């Protein structure tokens, strides 16, 4: 269990560093991947129709 925890920590650290400087550009691919793996209705780009703007969810669909 300790080995797995260390590996996950080492993987999370570089990803977190890449997401911070990338900002929104790094978040778009995450929404694409989440849409493919999820059965929820998601937009590729948020239409800003919700109170959670930028959440990726589209209230109209």
From Swiss-Prot:
A single GO molecular function term of this UniProt record: hormone activity
Residues annotated as signal peptide: none
UniProt entry keywords in alphabetical sequence: Antibiotic, Antimicrobial, Cleavage on pair of basic residues, Disulfide bond, Hormone, Secreted
Pfam family, one: Hepcidin
CC per GO annotation: extracellular region
Region Disordered: start-end pairs: 1-24
Pro-peptide region(s): 1-34
SS bond list: 43-59, 46-49, 47-55, 50-58
Subcellular location: Secreted
GO biological process: defense response to bacterium; intracellular iron ion homeostasis; negative regulation of cell population proliferation
Top-level division of the source organism's lineage: Eukaryota
Main location: secreted
Family per similarity comment: Belongs to the hepcidin family.
Role played: Seems to act as a signaling molecule involved in the maintenance of iron homeostasis. Seems to be required in conjunction with HFE to regulate both intestinal iron absorption and iron storage in macrophages. May also have antimicrobial activity.
Listed name of the protein: Hepcidin
Organism: Oncorhynchus mykiss
Name of the encoding gene: hamp
